[in-house]
Amino acid sequence: CLDTGHIQLVHRQPADYIRKAGSRLKLLHMHENDAYGDLHQMPYTFGSSKECGTDWDSLASALADIGFDGTLSFETFPCMNSFPYGTRDEVLRTIHEVGVYIKGKIDVLSEQFVQNSVKNK
C-alpha cells in the first residue's frame, strides 16, 4: 500500500515509489495535498507542479508500467468540508469522475505499453 499524499509530504512524487513497489503494489491511497500539510484533497486540487502537487500523469504512467490491477482508494473525505452541505453529492460525483479519468489514463497507457512490448520483440 502506498499513499500519494504522504509521499508528497516528503517532497517526492509517487511514480518513483510505484515503480519500486512493482507487482507488490495492491492498494494505492490517492489524495492530494500541498506538500506541507496532510490535507486529503481530491486529485488535481493543487495542479501537477512538482513543487506543490502530485504529477498525476506520471503516476498513471507508472501504474501502467507495472501492470497495476489493484485498488485505487480515494482518501478525500476532508475535502467534503470545503463545500456547502447541499453540494456534497455533486462533490462525490466529481471525485468519482476524477477516479474514472485516472483509471482511463492507466488503461490507455497499459495498452500502449503492451503494444510497444510486442513491437519490440
Task: Annotate the PLM regions.
Residues 1-121:
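Histidine-acidic metal/acid-base catalytic patches
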